[in-house]
UniProtKB/Swiss-Prot annotation:
Stretches that traverse the bilayer: 2-22, 29-49, 55-75, 94-114, 125-145, 173-193, 205-225, 244-264, 270-290, 294-314
Organism of derivation: Arabidopsis thaliana
Domain of life, source organism: Eukaryota
Any single Gene Ontology cellular-component annotation: membrane
Protein family membership: Belongs to the drug/metabolite transporter (DMT) superfamily. Plant drug/metabolite exporter (P-DME) (TC 2.A.7.4) family.
Subcellular localization: Membrane
Protein name (database record): WAT1-related protein At4g30420
Stored InterPro entries: EamA_dom, WAT1-related
Keywords: Membrane, Repeat, Transmembrane, Transmembrane helix
Membrane topology designation: Multi-pass membrane protein
Repeat found in the keyword field: yes
Pfam families for the chain: EamA
Length: 373
């Protein structure tokens, strides 16, 4: 349920961010304010929660500082800048659809890193490979095979705010997709890096707070060097302010905390498997309310991505059941050992130095008991 709510937040950010960027807000400024609002929200919440529970905020040593700084650089600064540039140059539907290859990429990297197991002699192991290939092929077809237009008409794209400047229209789609693919790689690495970081720094709320703070500092440096126009730093409408605030609180502060918790419990691939839900929501709402065009190639590729994704999910289902059986067996073994240890424990001490009742008390109590009955 928590991961489903996160995908709803991401879908809202994708739609509203696309609309805000098209109307003139710089992608880099949007990311900066998003992370700043997330930091402003999460640190007081962290302080109040720790004060109420009387638990100190986890401090940072050199290793944890380096790991969190690296994760913030990959998962926030680089990832979000690439994603919003790609989102600006393509569409909301494309931005969410390309994210469907994140589970396949995450599974592949997790396998190479030793977090996922793969048995080529098992049909489920082969399903993981086939599903991964199908996901990648579907994503490529979405990019290269646009085909006939199914829904809505094409709208002009003002690209003066793009970091690339003015481009020909036929180049914007391909370059935007390249940005989106690069963003998915960064996000997959971010999910996988959560495993060693969570093991070394298990405080998920503090981890999210530090990531938001480091991301804000990094994004401020990037925006300072790339955004030369001082007017670009100003939020000119309530809709821009509301979008940045919503993205910061919902899609950064809260989602980072929940995802860190989910990854610690179920692993990075489990967290990545919920991305197709965001695609379905965004595609429907973008076509209905924002009149974004839908192409045949994108539709076929999207279906291929989702089919490949759930092929991988079916392949992973056996691993989940095996892990659950292993945990159940471990728990049964612990209970059995506990019972055996308890049976060897002396329950009653027979060698008392002094009797519990004296002879007089025992005789008097027996007589009283007989009189009552």
């Amino acid at each position: 349920m928590a991961m489903t709510m996160i995908q709803l937040c991401y879908a809202g950010v994708t739609l509203f961010a696309r609309a805000t960027l098209v109307h003139g807000l710089s992608p880099r400024v949007f990311i900066l304010y998003r992370q700043a609002f997330a930091t402003i929200f999460i640190f007081p919440f962290l302080y109040l929660s720790r004060r109420k529970s009387k638990i100190a905020i986890s401090s940072l040593d050199l290793k944890s500082f380096s790991l969190i700084f690296l994760v913030s650089l990959i998962g926030i600064t680089i990832n979000q800048n690439l994603y919003l540039e790609g989102l600006y140059l393509t569409s909301s539907s494309m931005g969410s659809a390309v994210g469907n290859i994140i589970p396949a990429i995450t599974f592949l990297i997790s396998f190479l890193a030793g977090y996922e197991k793969l048995n080529l002699r098992d049909i489920r192991g082969l399903a993981k490979i086939a599903g991964t290939i199908l996901c990648v092929a579907g994503a490529i077809s979405m990019t290269l095979l646009r085909g006939p237009k199914i829904l809505n008409s094409e709208s002009a794209l003002p690209i003066a705010k793009s970091v690339l400047g003015h481009l020909k229209d036929q180049n914007t789609w391909l370059i935007g997709c390249l940005f989106l693919f690069s963003s998915t790689l960064c996000w997959s690495f971010w999910l996988i890096l959560q495993v060693p970081i969570s093991a070394y720094y298990p405080d998920n709320l503090s981890l999210s707070a530090w990531m938001c703070l480091f991301g804000t500092i990094q994004c401020a440096v990037v925006t300072f060097f790339l955004e030369k126009d001082p007017n670009a730093w100003i939020l000119h409408s309530y809709s821009e302010f509301a979008t940045c605030l919503y993205a910061g609180i919902g899609a950064s502060a809260l989602s980072f905390t929940v995802q860190a918790w989910a990854i610690a419990k179920r692993g990075p691939v489990f967290s990545a498997l919920f991305n197709p839900l965001c695609t379905v929501i965004v595609t429907i709402l973008a076509a209905l309310f924002f009149h974004e065009e839908i192409y045949t190639g994108s539709l076929i590729g999207g279906l291929g991505v989702i089919l490949g994704l759930y092929t991988v999910l079916w392949g992973k289902a056996k691993d989940v059941m095996m892990n659950q059986d292993q945990r159940d067996n471990d728990q049964k073994s612990e209970v059995k050992i506990h019972i055996e240890d308890s049976s060897n424990t002396t329950i009653c001490n027979k060698d008392l130095k002094n009797p519990l009742l004296s002879k007089h008390k025992s005789t008097e109590e027996i007589q009283t008991h007989q009189q009552l009955y």
